[in-house]
Structure formats: C-alpha cells, structure tokens
Curated annotation (Swiss-Prot):
One of its GO terms (biological process) is response to hypoxia. This is NAC domain-containing protein 102. It comes from Arabidopsis thaliana (Mouse-ear cress). It comes from the Eukaryota. Residues 50-202 form the NAC domain. InterPro entries: NAC-dom, NAC_dom_sf. It is found in: Nucleus. The lineage of its organism: Eukaryota, Viridiplantae, Streptophyta, Embryophyta, Tracheophyta.
C-alpha cells in the first residue's frame, strides 16, 4: 500500500480511509505536537517511527509551500524529515548518512554563500569538487511564483576540469528575494537564509569519486632515482630492478667540438702527417664539404675558415 507523507494543515495527509491508519496518524500528531512544545524534535531517522508503506514524495510546489516557505519564515515544520546542514561542505555521497529520511533521494535545508563579497552569485564549491548548473530555472507555484527550481550536476575535482558524476541536486529557493550586494551587511558572505535541496544519484548507486581519481595528470613527474631520467612524461612509468628508463641524449657544444678538432689537426701538423701528398688532397676535399655546411645563406661567407693544406 503506497502512501504520501507531507506537511500541510495537519502533519500527515494520506489518501486512505482505513480507521486504524487514521488513529495512527492522530497518535503521531499528538506525539509530535508535544515534542514541538517541548522543543525535543527527533534528530535521527529511527526516531520517526514511520509505519511500512509511507513515502516522503512531495511535489515541487509542496516542497516550496509547506517546507521552504515555513523554514524561511521560522515557522515550525511538523514532520522533521529534512535535516539542516551546510551542504556545500560535503561531497554528495557523504550526504545520505546525514539525512533524516530517504532511501534513494535525500532532502536538506542549507545556506548559500556568495562567491564574491560584492556579488550575488552563489559559491558552488563543495567537498572535493563543485556543483554546476544545467538547464534553465523552473518557476514553482501558480498563479503566483513562490520559488525557483534549479538543477545542478556534481563534478569531482577542480574547476573547470572536473569529472562529471551521476550525482544530481534540485535546489529550491524563494522567488522575489533581493540578493544583491547592496543588501549585504558588514561584508557578509551569506547569500540566502535557506534553500531546500533534493539530492539523488541518477543511477541509483552510492558511487564515490576520490580526489586522486578526479585530477588528471598534466605535469611531468620528477624522480630522484639515479637509474631513471630526470623527466618522466607519464606518471605510470616507474623504476624497477628489471628495466630502466632511457635518459635524454646529451648535446655536445659545437664550439668545444671544433676547438678539440683544431687541437687534433695542430698535433697532426707538428708530426708531419699533413705533409703527406696522398693525404692532403683527400682531407682538403672532405673539409671543404664540411665547411660548406656552415655557409651563411645571406652573406655567402663561411662561419669557419680552416686551411689545413700548407701555404705555398
């Protein structure tokens, strides 16, 4: 048997005429009314003691009219099924344990803070990620608009490169409320007194996104192991005893190489090797090709002037 549980004039309203159910409702009304007068509302799920078959499944208009409007007006809410938390301090998969009621969707009252002290945009950072709005805002209430419904998706990681998750939030706020910076007193970051949030996972799972999995590797990872290169492109590449990472090739300075080459030719000349008629023409031909590669294309002058053959 499916029942609907929501707050209106009485605490419970169900579409059923069974006298035992009616008596149960009256009993619960008396208990909760007494607790309301004593200020001892239940704080945990188990204290609700709802019978099997009851479901908290209010419409958008019921959420705004019977819950959000009353909370913002500091009026009592007879059925304590919506917890009051700072929702933006937590990841969405942490919220179900903080809810007072719910199996596949959970409801919360929360404040919103400004993103900037002098602005009216809300700060959407939450836990290890952030909430991102999707779609258009939906007005709630007819003929007069009472509230605004906004849909948001949770992204794990840092904006704007977070990983999209399956966690969804429907945020309900009151309409026609001045949230401009001109009403901001004493540089207060508080944007709203209260908003009402419905949280659920569209796949019906309790999937979690850890920070390590949310951040994509974008920087080179350095290692101090002498067997590895000083720059390893992929973080998946590690050092082991069975294989090594090839180090980067070392470039030889051209001036040092030429200086060493001149020293060698001077040594050859001193011992008479360059006086060999058979060696000199062949070496002049090879050196001529080598010098041509260093020609300046604009001045057509060689960068280097080598004369290996003896002057006659």
């Amino acid at each position: 048997m499916d029942f609907a549980l929501f707050s209106s004039i009485s605490i419970f309203e169900i579409n059923h005429k069974d006298p035992p159910i009616r008596r149960f409702i009256k009993t619960q009304n008396r208990i909760l009314s007494t607790r309301k007068q004593q200020g001892t509302f239940p704080k945990m799920k188990a204290e609700l003691n709802l019978p099997a078959g009851f479901r908290f499944h209010p419409t958008d208009e019921e959420l705004v009219k019977f819950y959000l409007c009353r909370r913002c007006a500091s009026e009592p809410i007879n059925v304590p099924v919506i917890a009051e938390i700072d929702l933006y301090k937590f990841n969405p998969w942490e919220l179900p344990e903080m809810a007072l009621y719910g199996e596949k969707e959970w409801y919360f009252f929360s404040h919103r803070d400004r993103k900037y002290p002098n602005g009216s945009r809300p700060n959407r950072a939450a836990g290890t990620g952030y909430w991102k709005a999707t779609g258009a805002d939906k007005p709630i209430g007819k003929p007069k608009t009472l509230g605004i419904k906004k849909a948001l998706v949770f992204y794990a990681g840092k904006a704007p490169k977070g990983i999209k998750t399956n966690w969804i939030m429907h945020e309900y706020r009151l309409a026609n409320v001045d949230r401009s910076a001109s009403t901001n007193k004493k540089n207060n970051l508080r944007l709203d007194d209260w908003v009402l949030c419905r949280i659920y996972n569209k796949k019906g799972t309790m999937e979690k996104y850890l920070p390590a999995a949310a951040e994509k590797p974008t920087e080179k990872m350095s290692t101090s192991d002498s067997r590895c290169s000083s720059h390893v492109i992929s973080p998946d590449v590690t050092c082991s005893d069975n294989w090594e990472v090839e180090s980067e090739p070392k470039w030889i300075n051209l001036e040092d190489a030429l200086e060493a080459f001149n020293d060698d030719t001077s040594m050859f000349s001193s011992i008479g090797l360059l006086q060999n008629d058979a060696f000199v023409p062949q070496f002049q031909y090879q050196s001529s090709d080598f010098v041509d590669s260093f020609q300046d294309p604009f001045e057509q002058k060689p960068f280097l002037n080598w004369n290996f053959a003896p002057q006659g």
